């Protein structure tokens, strides 16, 4: 008896720059006048590694399953997932922040606070090594190597390290890697086999970290493909391994990115979210001198996406805004989410608490999504009255397919905008 599985939604995300046009930071005719340059930029970017990577990974996985890179990532993720209860990811830059963005967007909002059973048997995930924050690093060491308590064979005491080569061999990452690998060696009692099994490295072929895994006997050393900009590592093992370990569906993530690639390649300029986003961003700089950009959202699950976006712009030498609090010199793009994934909360009647003190009488029975929609409308009205330059990216929901679309759209738009600036 076969089981028919329901088809998961693949609704497209949308870009709406109407508020930016209304604020006068860029004129619609100016954006329309960029059509030929946008077509030329698209032709260049179509051949780039940032566009080809998701499609290549999916194609190889479909045709060469056991020999494909994605299969190797999923196999390692499964092994780590079954062996430990916490993974420490060491590294900095946009690649690692991309892994964090996928984790926070696609997993339970309080994944690390849940019991292992409530997490579906998936490990906790912690991040370190992006700055010299002594107390943060010591705090994480307290969790994985608690003082005064012997670490036994209990699965809940076991942990592993994913070490990601820092951009330009970042000293912060190198120092953190040395500290945490020393702690890991102590945690396994110096057992070389266990140590090798608990370490995964991800690096370019030219980075010294690439030699660490084979040096300690580990077979889990992944390479960042040649030609992939360090900023755009979220769809390499940097982002995919950690996401798979904590239970995110990385195949759907890549399918979302591939869907955005198709729209980028095939959609007319006027209906192309990548090209329209790049054109508005570029036009705001040319017409109004606004070169700082930020993302803002009412969803805490998208905060790491905003931080990731700031990094992919700043690591190229551009300027990024400070998020929702950025001033009028920043083009703020709101990430507006449609459906919620969990059961809808409703404002209850006051009951024995009394009535009137909290002034919520008119809201009894309203759902959280209804209140969110009203809050977003107020923000839009406030921005319009203040003349703040904004635009919207409309997300049907937050899931792997949507996040794959969003990340790929923003990476492609960054590359296209860079082409426009250089032209």
PLM features per residue range, with description:
Residues 60, 86-93, 160-167, 200, ...:
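Short glycine-rich or small-residue beta-strand-to-loop segments that form or flank ligand, phosphate
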Residues 292-293, 297-411, 415-423:
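C-terminal catalytic subdomain
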Residues 72-85, 142-158, 280-291, 328:
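Glycine-rich phosphate/diphosphate-binding loops that line cofactor/substrate pockets in enzymes
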Residues 186-333, 342, 422-423:
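Active-site phosphate/pyrophosphate-binding segments
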Residues 105-116, 120-121, 183-186, 312-323:
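Short helix-loop-beta junction
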Residues 55-75, 102-160:
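Glycine-rich oxoanion-binding loops at beta->alpha junctions
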Residues 159, 163-183, 202-258, 370, ...:
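Short alpha-helices
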Residues 1-78, 353-358, 362, 378:
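Extended, charge-enriched "interface" segments that sit outside catalytic cores
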């Amino acid at each position: 008896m076969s089981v028919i599985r329901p088809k998961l939604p693949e609704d497209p995300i949308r870009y709406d720059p109407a508020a930016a046009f209304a604020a006068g930071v860029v004129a619609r005719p100016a954006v329309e006048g960029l059509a030929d340059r946008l077509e030329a930029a698209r032709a260049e970017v179509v051949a780039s590694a940032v566009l080809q990577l998701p499609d290549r990974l999916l194609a190889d996985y479909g045709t060469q399953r056991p020999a494909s890179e994605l299969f190797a990532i999923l196999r390692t993720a499964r092994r780590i997932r079954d062996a430990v209860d916490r993974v420490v990811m060491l590294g900095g830059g946009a690649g690692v922040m991309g892994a964090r963005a996928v984790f926070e967007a696609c997993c339970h909002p309080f994944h690390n606070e849940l019991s292992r059973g409530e997490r579906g048997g998936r490990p906790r995930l912690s991040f370190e090594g992006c700055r010299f924050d002594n107390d943060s690093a010591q705090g994480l060491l307290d969790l994985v190597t608690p003082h005064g308590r012997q670490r036994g064979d209990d699965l809940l005491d076991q942990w592993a390290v994913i070490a990601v080569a820092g951009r330009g061999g970042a000293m912060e990452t190198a120092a953190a890697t040395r500290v945490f690998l020393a702690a890991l060696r102590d945690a396994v009692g110096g057992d070389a086999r266990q140590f090798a099994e608990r370490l995964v490295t991800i690096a370019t072929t030219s980075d010294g970290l690439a030699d660490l895994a084979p040096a300690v006997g580990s077979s889990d050393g992944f390479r960042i493909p040649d030609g992939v900009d360090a900023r755009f590592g979220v769809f390499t093992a940097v982002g995919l391994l950690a996401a798979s370990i904590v239970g995110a569906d990385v195949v759907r993530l890549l399918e979302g990115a591939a869907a955005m690639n198709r729209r980028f390649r095939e959609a007319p300029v006027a209906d192309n979210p990548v090209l329209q986003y790049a054109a508005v961003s570029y036009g705001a700089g040319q017409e109004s001198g606004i070169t700082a950009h930020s993302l803002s959202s009412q969803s805490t699950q998208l905060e790491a996406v905003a931080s990731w976006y700031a990094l992919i712009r700043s690591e190229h030498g551009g300027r990024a805004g400070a998020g929702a609090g950025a001033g009028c010199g920043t083009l703020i793009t709101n990430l507006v989410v449609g459906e919620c994934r969990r059961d809808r909360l409703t404002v209850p009647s006051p009951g024995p608490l009394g009535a009137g003190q909290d002034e919520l009488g008119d809201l009894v029975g309203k759902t959280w999504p209804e209140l969110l929609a009203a809050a977003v409308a107020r923000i839009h009205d406030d921005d319009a009255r203040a003349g703040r330059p904004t635009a919207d990216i409309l997300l049907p929901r937050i899931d792997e397919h949507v996040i794959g679309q969003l990340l790929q759209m923003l990476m492609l738009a960054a590359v296209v905008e860079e082409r426009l600036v250089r032209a």
